């Protein structure tokens, strides 16, 4: 299925921002086997949520909250701000930026703002999606698991302090819009 700006708007993208992402999405989705309407619906819903409906490829917050977060690889002073969320899925932390350097051969450590460019923003989101095997969860229509992996970094163990990802109800609403726009049946997502 071809991605168009009207399709992205029907999925919930802000009407003034999706055009720069259309060609990168069309160029790259199939390479990461985001190639069924259900997989596409889940992927698009998550990137719409993470990018404030394609209004930004840079996290609004300063990134100071990530300072010293060794779980993100932020081991040097200033890493939190330098490696705040970028791209359509908000890649966060020195370790995740370093993984992109290794995968793409582009120096995102020296040039973190490159992830704000449309092709890099899309490509980084797809690599993250693929590396976390999110197509499998999409095939199970499990919006909760996908949202936990993207927003919390993993599926929390029972009894963990934080179980519910930020904006879960908004993620579900975006998924419903994406399913409608892509013609996916009325399957009820796992919550």
Language model features with spans:
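Peptidoglycan-targeting cell-wall enzymes and recognition modules
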Residues: 2-20, 24, 43-128
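Amphipathic, Lys/Arg- and hydrophobic-enriched alpha-helical face
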Residues: 24-30
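Non-transmembrane alpha-helical segments in soluble domains
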Residues: 26, 44-47, 125-126, 147, ...
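Surface-exposed patches in mature extracellular/periplasmic domains of secreted proteins
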Residues: 31-43, 56-60, 135-147, 190
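Acidic helix/loop microenvironments that form the catalytic cleft of cell-wall polysaccharide enzymes
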Residues: 47-50, 138-163
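A generic secondary-structure signal for well-formed alpha-helical elements
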Residues: 50-54, 95, 132-133, 154, ...
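Extended serine/threonine-enriched, polar tracts that run as long, contiguous segments within proteins
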Residues: 130-135, 150
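Low-complexity, Gly/Ser/Thr/Pro-rich intrinsically disordered linker/tail segments
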Residues: 153, 157-191
């Amino acid at each position: 299925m071809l991605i168009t700006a009207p399709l992205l708007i029907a999925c919930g993208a802000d009407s003034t921002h999706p055009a720069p992402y259309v060609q990168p999405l069309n160029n790259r989705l199939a390479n990461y086997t985001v190639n069924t309407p259900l997989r596409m619906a889940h992927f698009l819903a998550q990137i719409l949520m993470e990018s404030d409906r394609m209004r930004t490829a840079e996290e609004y917050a300063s990134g100071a909250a990530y300072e010293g977060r060794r779980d993100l690889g932020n081991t040097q002073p200033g890493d939190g701000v330098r490696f705040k969320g970028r791209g359509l899925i908000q890649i966060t932390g020195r370790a995740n930026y370093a993984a992109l350097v290794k995968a793409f051969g582009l120096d995102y450590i020296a040039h973190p703002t490159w992830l704000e460019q449309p092709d890099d923003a899309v490509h980084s989101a797809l690599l993250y999606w693929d590396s976390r095997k999110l197509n499998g969860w999409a095939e199970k229509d499990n919006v909760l698991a996908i949202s936990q992996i993207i927003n919390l970094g993993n599926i929390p163990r029972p009894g963990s302090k934080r179980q519910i990802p930020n904006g879960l109800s908004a993620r579900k609403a975006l998924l419903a819009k994406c399913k409608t726009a892509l013609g996916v049946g009325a399957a009820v997502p796992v919550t």
